């Protein structure tokens, strides 16, 4: 078990959990996740230097009530070919641990040839163990900084490991689960200010009856309290207040930015909101399903209040109700923690990616079709300060079909480290992530956000748009110091799209009435085969842009012709984020198909545009 090599760190972790201090370590390094209605809790600590994770599972055996506990690591929540550590305890008489994996049909649990679940401590109520990020074992999942899934179960019996395998346990509903998690995450941020100086601002709906339709955007415009309108404050944290987790898809809070136009309070569907309400479009806080609270770094806070701050803010809640449920009452919203003593920098939020428009489309039957959204060098050159900006947080966002999202960073012809990347993105888990590496973006840099979509099983085309059945591609970046640049997004230029439809009509003989006709109708008129899918991908990858380099009032920056703007050129495929350092696979394991690979079941690696280059 190599206990000597980890004595100090194991001591730190184990004693920290029992509140005995043998070394000074902050609680910011400890992350936690409730596995079972707060009865069973997982705590973990990432050791970036040694590239390993320490785990502690509290109340795993419930003081001897259960004898076997399994915790597994899965790429997308699938139960087949999942990497499990299985622990057994019999009233402190003996303890047992096996590194295992599930079979392709999820019927059997097989013991690994190499054992990599290193136990630090076990008793009849808890488990503490560690595992390397990458064990170089094809029978183990590689830990990464994107979305992973924890699969767990427990039994009141011991498993029969005859011939080094057993039947996958059939745990009761209360004693198993699957949860998304970012395992390799940055340390938590502690609010520097004392709790006594924190003030709370709440913006939430007022007992709204959720409409029995698939997609509803509900808006509420409210006036800030006088203590906020008089003095500028900094937001240091915001957290969601969710009434109906199965209906609330995402929420945003916007600042109203107007030129002396009067804003009225409002509470109703966003489509019916007065025109003045649409001036409330500067993002202040946002949340999407799966996320928790978000805390700003100690050097920055998001401005709110003061004499120059419009006293109105707008809450927008997206209800996703595909089952058309009725009779549900909702008062969801945000709690915002603010301080009056300002921090060094004003922070801000910027939208990267694609416009919400039906100019972009995804053909059916694709494994991972890419769409690209650009923040071109000409925009950052005009809009960013001379010393640039620092990005400290990022929230990737798509709707139902998104399976991979990343934002690349370019300075001239040089590609810098990625801003954010999730090769196993899930629309069910769209948290704002603190960035361990904080990109420094200078004027003249370019940012390219790519989203990949899985449309297998869909018979018709998917268009860009606001509905949950449409698609989006966005990266909300949190940065400082604040600038006037609110949106840096793109779409294919109108001329390029017209030329594409004309080609489909004249050359491909598709049933398009007019290249200038409604875009959605033109897309839906195309009969999609592999050749036409390739042509569409090539068109998106090479065509000039309609660029939105926008201020918070929705107006573009002056100084450049944003229509038919040039794309940012870059190399395919996407660079490897974490090159593996394994020497070689042991000869007796070379026959085994790695749990990290598969025939396109690993959507993070089976990417359409990469395979296309090999044709």
Name each model feature, range by range:
Residues 7-22:
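Cleavable N-terminal signal peptides of Sec/SRP-targeted secreted and luminal proteins
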Residues 22-196, 266-291, 527-529, 535, ...:
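Extracellular-facing/secreted segment signature in eukaryotic proteins
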Residues 27, 33-40, 185-249, 323-401, ...:
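Solvent-exposed, flexible loop/coil segments flanking beta-strands in beta-rich domains
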Residues 118-123, 140-143, 284-310, 325, ...:
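Exposed beta-sheet edge/beta-hairpin loop segments within beta-rich domains
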Residues 126, 236, 301-320, 439-453:
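Noncatalytic modules at the cell exterior or secretory-pathway interfaces
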Residues 135-137, 320-324, 452-461:
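Short acidic/polar inter-strand loop motif in beta-rich domains
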Residues 250-259, 403-415:
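Short, surface-exposed beta-strand/strand-loop-strand elements in extracellular ectodomains
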Residues 252, 257-258, 262-314:
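Long, hydrophobic/aromatic-enriched structural stretches that serve as scaffold segments
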